[in-house]
């Protein structure tokens, strides 16, 4: 089943996108700063969400990791 139709997988993909964009913005600030328009604006917004909601994103990462390790089937 694709990540679009499975809610848990969709949340996992969104979380990974936020974490990746935040990491890239920390390592290469100019990479996302000049791309605030168009389709790439989504990645800039994900980086902002990751920076501003960092404790909540971290807790959600831990929760999803435990859920992935121990399974929920």
From Swiss-Prot:
It is a single-pass type I membrane protein. InterPro entries: KISH_domain (IPR051523), Ksh1 (IPR009653). Disruption phenotype: Inviable. Residues 1-21 form the signal peptide. Residues 22-52 are lumenal. It is found in: Golgi apparatus membrane; Endoplasmic reticulum membrane. GO terms for biological process: intracellular transport; protein secretion; vesicle-mediated transport. The keyword ATP-binding does not apply. The chain crosses the membrane at residues 53-73. Pfam families: DUF1242. One of its GO terms (cellular component) is endoplasmic reticulum membrane. Keywords: Endoplasmic reticulum, Golgi apparatus, Membrane, Signal, Transmembrane, Transmembrane helix. Involved in the early part of the secretory pathway. Belongs to the KISH family. This is Protein kish. It comes from Schizosaccharomyces pombe (strain 972 / ATCC 24843) (Fission yeast).
